[in-house]
Amino acid sequence: MPNFIDYTKYYGEKSFEEVPFNDIDALILAELSYLNFSDVSDELPNTIENISKSYFYVVTKEKIKSKKNVYKYAHNLFGYVKTSPRFKDIEMINYSRIVDSKKQFGAITFKYNDWIYISYEGTNEYMSGWREDFDLSNTFPVPSQKLAAEYLIGEAKKHNKIYVGGHSKGGNLAVAAAMQADEKVRKKIITVYDFDGPGVREKEFNSDQFQTLIPKIKKFTPEVSVIGMILYSTPNYTVVKSDYKGILQHHAMSWQCFGSYFIPAKQSKSSIKFNKSIKDFLKDNTEEELRNFVKAIFEVLQKSDITSTETVTIKKIIKCVNYVRQLNTYDPKTKDKLLKLFNIVLALYTNK
């Protein structure tokens, strides 16, 4: 079935004046934020077409072979949009990339005529980004969310029509940035695009900052959603048909579209069950308990060689369960919670 690559072929000849900016355009620009433009950032601002020449000279097919699928997909996508009349003249400006032991942050702004799209990068291969994803359950804002807000506020000083968006953690950063912005900046935001990103804690969900933002949030998840079902998000989300199975549906490359629209679908029963289980699971814990619990999860994942959604397999989840069972370093309460959590994930992965 057609995906966003097919969209670039069908609509690549159409200008934004002929076919207005839409949800699939937003996903395409969100996916491009996964690419590392550090080696060509001194050429910004510049058009997609011009930057692509330098980018593909530096980042060869050989270099991308060892990368995770999300980078390969984005690399392939960039190859399609670089000469597309619809995308090639979009300006790329203000590339930011910060990675250290405590945070992972990436953002780039795309500008076309009088509007901009701020694209936040999702979780990459660095462990600091993976760790931040877990910290969302006990902290707000995490370091990357603070950086996302600063980035948005900086761009809002220069532009008046703003879209913000991202895939996975990038979707969460888009929402978090808008939440932290003042009313003057919020008025400039047209839409906040959240493509299967984790939500926020119940405390932030119930805040005025989030509730008043809901009308501007457009969230999309696949039928089987794990990342996008974590914590609390806008209740008005769209489920998209995917041609991948299980947790791999998180890859937006698998999301099906028809024309300039995503093909709608129904949330899987396993995703609904997972969402409820995680919320129930988090309710009865203090912030300190959650911090310690996240630390324990992270240790188990590392011991089981799980560093991203792409490295998750049934064998590795079972390895997590067995590892926890054999441990004597955690108190009984933490050990019990770890077992419940990994069994929930195992049930989701096996669609039981």
Predicted regions and their residues:
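Alpha/beta hydrolase fold serine-hydrolase catalytic domain that processes acyl esters and thioesters
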Residues: 1-24, 29-108, 112-116, 120-161, ...
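Gly/Ala-rich beta-loop-alpha elbow adjacent to hydrolase catalytic centers
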Residues: 166-170, 174
